[in-house]
């Protein structure tokens, strides 16, 4: 393969990667833990926290905090998983590129 063809191929791959990354960034991911639900953008920006109030007593504040953390962390894992699924073919498993 000559240098020009390699450059064209690299540009094509870069374009595909950027498109896949943009798709992930614009997607809304949802996570939940017991009576807490969250929505987060693919950029890992938290956009919504929903709490089912009927299940919450005033004394359950600490548990609520834990449930929010779990829901957020689960959603971040989903975003990371989808990012790896969509972009892993370009990075050959090299972590941290996106």
Which sequence ranges carry the predicted segments?
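Long amphipathic alpha-helical segments used for membrane anchoring, targeting, substrate engagement
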Residues: 1-30, 78-98
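Residue-level signature of catalytic and energy-coupling elements of molecular machines
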Residues: 10, 44, 68
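A short interface-forming secondary-structure element
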Residues: 49-61
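N-terminal intrinsically disordered, cationic/polar leader segments
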Residues: 29-50
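Stable alpha-helical structural segments in soluble proteins, enriched in small hydrophobic residues
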Residues: 67, 71-82
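Short amphipathic alpha-helical "recognition" segments used for binding
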Residues: 18-20, 58, 69
């Amino acid at each position: 393969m000559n240098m020009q063809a390699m450059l064209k191929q690299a540009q094509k791959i870069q374009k595909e990667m950027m498109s896949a990354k943009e798709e992930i960034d614009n997607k809304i991911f949802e996570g939940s833990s017991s009576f807490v639900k969250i929505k987060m953008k693919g950029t890992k920006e938290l956009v919504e926290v929903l709490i089912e109030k009927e299940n919450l007593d005033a004394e359950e504040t600490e548990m609520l905090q834990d449930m929010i953390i779990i829901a957020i962390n689960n959603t971040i894992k989903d975003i990371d998983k989808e990012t790896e699924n969509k972009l892993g073919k370009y990075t050959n498993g090299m972590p941290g590129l996106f």
